[in-house]
């Protein structure tokens, strides 16, 4: 369960280490007063992170640090809390787009780009770990890895997973990409790439940006043609996985191979 975050004034998240002292005689409202050098308090997220480590911060406090200062009229901690509430978990943020972030009044293009960059780094790290742990004899692990890799793409992507004679991973690469609804895939190119990798078996996958994972008639036709073409060069097609954001469809599991 996510921990609630105390709502602090947005001014407390501003980096003003080089800010000069207030001019004599100038009265500044307390909620606009800037922090001076050395004015560190342990309840401030940035200082607490440096003093105690990142584990001491809640999810929304970590997001608030990424956002930096709040936009005028929008407390950065309230915005961070709204993101956590909307997506439910930090993993849910991996599926968010720039438009999703900018739908929040406290987030503009710069902050949105920062969040997208961080979530993409996190997503790629998860894919790397999933590839390292992937056991080809565990369909669930394979499908999870494929979903992490292409499930959130906003356009169609076709990838191939090359395996050796013991079903160990040789490589995974993108074969083609298309638009939101259409993509050109050439079986002979997949066969050529499989032979170049000296693969004994193959798993192919593509995503449906709509999120619906039910294969189309064209998906089924392509799978039959590809399976026949690979058999001519003694390469086994183990599966064709259709990937959505949160679900997958396996041709092998459905008995369509």
From Swiss-Prot:
Describe the family membership recorded for this protein in Swiss-Prot or TrEMBL: Belongs to the UPF0758 family.
Recall the GO molecular function terms of this protein's record. Answer: metal ion binding; metallopeptidase activity
Motif annotated as JAMM motif, chain positions = 206-219
**GO biological process terms on file:** proteolysis
Compositional bias (Basic and acidic residues) at which positions?
37-51
Keyword check for Hydrolase? yes
Keywords assigned by UniProt, alphabetized: Hydrolase, Metal-binding, Metalloprotease, Protease, Zinc
Official protein name in the record: UPF0758 protein Bcen2424_2501
State the PROSITE patterns in the record.
Answer: MPN, UPF0758
From which source organism is this entry?
Answer: Burkholderia cenocepacia (strain HI2424)
- Gene3D superfamilies associated with the record: 5' to 3' exonuclease, C-terminal subdomain (1.10.150.20), Cytidine Deaminase, domain 2 (3.40.140.10)
Annotated region (Disordered) at 1-53
Q: Which residues form the MPN domain?
A: 135-257
**Presence of the UniProt keyword Phosphoprotein in the record:** no
Residues engaged in binding Zn(2+): 206, 208, 219
């Amino acid at each position: 369960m996510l921990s609630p975050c105390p709502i602090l004034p947005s001014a407390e998240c501003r980096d003003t280490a080089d800010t000069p002292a207030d001019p004599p005689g100038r009265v500044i409202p307390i909620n606009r007063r800037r922090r001076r050098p050395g004015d560190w308090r342990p309840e401030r997220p940035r200082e607490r992170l440096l003093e105690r480590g990142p584990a001491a911060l809640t999810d929304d406090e970590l997001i608030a640090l990424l956002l930096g200062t709040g936009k005028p009229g929008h407390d950065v901690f309230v915005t961070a809390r709204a993101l956590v509430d909307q997506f439910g978990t930090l993993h849910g943020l991996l599926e968010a787009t720039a438009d999703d972030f900018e739908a929040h009044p406290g987030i503009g293009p710069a902050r949105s780009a920062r969040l997208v960059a961080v979530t993409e780094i996190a997503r790629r790290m998860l894919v790397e770990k999933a590839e390292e742990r992937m056991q080809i004899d565990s369909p669930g692990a394979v499908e999870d890895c494929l979903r992490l890799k292409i499930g959130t793409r906003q356009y169609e992507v076709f990838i191939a997973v090359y395996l050796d004679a013991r079903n160990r991973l040789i490589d995974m690469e993108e074969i083609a990409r298309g638009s939101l609804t259409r993509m050109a895939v050439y079986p002979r190119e997949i066969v050529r790439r499989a032979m170049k990798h000296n693969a004994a078996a193959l798993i192919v996958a593509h995503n449906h940006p709509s999120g619906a994972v039910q294969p189309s008639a064209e998906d089924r036709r392509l799978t039959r043609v590809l399976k026949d073409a690979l058999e001519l060069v003694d390469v086994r097609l183990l599966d064709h996985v259709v990937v959505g954001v949160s679900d997958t469809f396996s041709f092998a599991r459905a008995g369509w191979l």
